[in-house]
Amino acid sequence: MGQAGKALREVLTSYGISQNKLATAMGLPRSAVYKWVHEERDPTALTVVGIVKALRGMNSEAAEAFIRLYLGEPTENED
């Protein structure tokens, strides 16, 4: 457990976004975001998409940072 939670915690801290603000933007209770950030529960793939959309609405750099931290850096396909 935890890759999404770790990435989300780092992004929220780095960009000054509160758990409550993200939860409100997603239409979810703050407790859901708390559980992801504290690695008590992993968000589903569909929820990760919702996290990215909500972050983009607040700060596009935060959304890109979350994607990068969660998925890692893209690698070039070497032939």
Which residues does each PLM region occupy?
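Short, charged recognition helix plus adjacent turn
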Residues: 16, 35, 61-79
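Residue-level detection of beta-strand scaffold positions
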Residues: 22-27, 39, 54, 69
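Recognition helix of helix-turn-helix/homeodomain-like DNA-binding domains
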Residues: 27-43
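DNA major-groove recognition helix of helix-turn-helix/homeodomain DNA-binding modules
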Residues: 45-65
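Alpha-solenoid HEAT/Armadillo repeat architecture
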Residues: 13, 38-41, 56
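A short, Lys/Arg-rich alpha-helix, primarily the initiator
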Residues: 1-16, 21, 25, 52-53, ...
